[in-house]
């Protein structure tokens, strides 16, 4: 593998992880904000809100994990080699 392809793969891996973390990070923050506001307004619905929040946070976090998988593929199993 030539040096330009290697350097581009490393840059792309960094961008994959970085950009894959921005969207879910913002989404998790706003989802948590909504859950806290909902629990503050209706404390009796705390269990249902918390369960829904945890499930949605797991789905959002999976997007970041997909970015990490793409970065690992670019670094260790480079399809452009």
Swiss-Prot record:
CDD domains per record: ATP-synt_Fo_c_ATPH
Site (Reversibly protonated during proton transport): 61
Species of provenance: Synechococcus sp. (strain CC9311)
Main localisation: membrane
Localization per Swiss-Prot or TrEMBL: Cellular thylakoid membrane
Record bears the keyword Transmembrane helix: yes
Known role: F(1)F(0) ATP synthase produces ATP from ADP in the presence of a proton or sodium gradient. F-type ATPases consist of two structural domains, F(1) containing the extramembraneous catalytic core and F(0) containing the membrane proton channel, linked together by a central stalk and a peripheral stalk. During catalysis, ATP synthesis in the catalytic domain of F(1) is coupled via a rotary mechanism of the central stalk subunits to proton translocation. Key component of the F(0) channel; it plays a direct role in translocation across the membrane. A homomeric c-ring of between 10-14 subunits forms the central stalk rotor element with the F(1) delta and epsilon subunits.
Record GO cellular component, one term: proton-transporting two-sector ATPase complex, proton-transporting domain
InterPro entries reported in the protein's UniProt record: ATP_synth_csu_bac/chlpt (IPR005953), ATP_synth_F0_csu (IPR000454), ATP_synth_F0_csu_DDCD_BS (IPR020537), ATP_synth_F0_csu_sf (IPR038662), ATPase_proteolipid_c-like_dom (IPR002379), F/V-ATP_Csub_sf (IPR035921)
Gene3D superfamilies to which the protein is assigned, alphabetical: F1F0 ATP synthase subunit C
Membrane topology label: Multi-pass membrane protein
Superkingdom classification of source: Bacteria
Subunit structure: F-type ATPases have 2 components, F(1) - the catalytic core - and F(0) - the membrane proton channel. F(1) has five subunits: alpha(3), beta(3), gamma(1), delta(1), epsilon(1). F(0) has four main subunits: a(1), b(1), b'(1) and c(10-14). The alpha and beta chains form an alternating ring which encloses part of the gamma chain. F(1) is attached to F(0) by a central stalk formed by the gamma and epsilon chains, while a peripheral stalk is formed by the delta, b and b' chains.
Entry keyword Transcription: no
Alphabetic keyword roster: ATP synthesis, CF(0), Hydrogen ion transport, Ion transport, Lipid-binding, Membrane, Thylakoid, Transmembrane, Transmembrane helix, Transport
Name by which UniProt lists this protein: ATP synthase subunit c
Disulfide bonds: none
MF-aspect GO terms: lipid binding; proton-transporting ATP synthase activity, rotational mechanism
PROSITE patterns: ATPASE_C
Transmembrane segments annotated in the record for this chain: 7-27, 57-77
Family named by the database record: Belongs to the ATPase C chain family.
